[in-house]
Amino acid sequence: MAFLWLLSCWALLGTTFGCGVPAIHPVLSGLSRIVNGEDAVPGSWPWQVSLQDKTGFHFCGGSLISEDWVVTAAHCGVRTSDVVVAGEFDQGSDEENIQVLKIAKVFKNPKFSILTVNNDITLLKLATPARFSQTVSAVCLPSADDDFPAGTLCATTGWGKTKYNANKTPDKLQQAALPLLSNAECKKSWGRRITDVMICAGASGVSSCMGDSGGPLVCQKDGAWTLVGIVSWGSRTCSTTTPAVYARVAKLIPWVQKILAAN
């Protein structure tokens, strides 16, 4: 059964820091919850943010694409009363140099449909810019014609559940390496629900899960990590043999560019 991977309470870039090149290098196992993932190296995914409500509850992930903008999933339902937390690794620690950033404006893709989960992207304009540092910087955006072929090994990160029936999410940021799938291959699991604005990955022993929604699926291009997908939906039990489905960022770039240019 298809399932959106947000957590509900009830269950253009910096000159000093180029995009997609972390100051602290990530270390990924070839097969690294996320289901069957592993703790990330602290600070090694500097664009990863946590979206939290006013009680401090983490409900979705997101990615910094500049000092002023975060990209996440439309189905996360972010509001301006929520906050973006940047520079975080361990959500159980009070020792980290985090940035808690207010949201000025929420731009949900007007073509988003909760029924089909097509166009699952929202842009967040920050009220005050993030301060880029060793542990806070932007991911690169793909161009509209970028092609990331099936079989490409990519990475996804998040504080989502490490088992679908876990009572709580992990404190430490999780990561997993996983291959991209062709949409034809993905349709073997999900049928006509898979559209050209989606990209699939996984079915390789790892999976995104509840609480990872909105976070990044990144692949390396010319030595820089590029945002290929946004965690969107998948198996209700976060099955590691079923592909996870992500919003296909390259297809959504024209809309992103339009919003950034107008704001």
Swiss-Prot record:
UniProt cross-references to InterPro entries, sorted A to Z: Peptidase_S1_PA, Peptidase_S1_PA_chymotrypsin, Peptidase_S1A, Trypsin_dom, TRYPSIN_HIS, TRYPSIN_SER
Gene3D superfamilies xrefs: Trypsin-like serine proteases
EC number: 3.4.21.1
Cellular component GO terms held in the UniProt record: extracellular region
Main location: secreted
Catalyzed reactions per annotation: Preferential cleavage: Tyr-|-Xaa, Trp-|-Xaa, Phe-|-Xaa, Leu-|-Xaa
Signal peptide: 1-18
Protein's cellular compartments: Secreted, Extracellular space
Uppermost EC category: hydrolase
A GO term for molecular function: serine-type endopeptidase activity
SUPFAM superfamilies per UniProt: Trypsin-like serine proteases
Pfam families from the UniProt entry: Trypsin
PROSITE patterns: TRYPSIN_DOM, TRYPSIN_HIS, TRYPSIN_SER
Active-site feature positions: H75 (charge relay system), D120 (charge relay system), S213 (charge relay system)
Keywords: Digestion, Disulfide bond, Hydrolase, Protease, Secreted, Serine protease, Signal, Zymogen
Keyword Cell cycle found: no
Full protein name: Chymotrypsinogen B2
